[in-house]
């Protein structure tokens, strides 16, 4: 049941130890090494007020074939700018 798994995932992330484990799982990764190994088409999206926006240009320079689509919505682009987010994904997927 997808809804149950989603709820349990969110509850675990909110839990004190779960939150630390989640952040460790993310931030302990060697993102640069993993990113450099990627060979698939890449769509890079971020809003100017997103915490990751300052890294958008660097990510594009590391993967010159990537497609960059700025959107709006701070750290919640799919929620706050769903039309631009969906349009960028549709364009990227050619649908």
Where do the model's predicted regions map?
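Conserved alpha/beta-hydrolase catalytic His-Asp/Glu region
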Residues: 1-35
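A short acidic, amphipathic alpha-helical/loop segment
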Residues: 34, 55-58, 84
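A structural signal for well-ordered alpha-helical scaffolds and beta->alpha junctions
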Residues: 16-19, 52, 82
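Conserved loop-alpha-helix segment in the C-terminal half of the alpha/beta-hydrolase fold
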Residues: 41-79
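Post-His helix in hydrolase/transferase enzymes
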Residues: 78-93
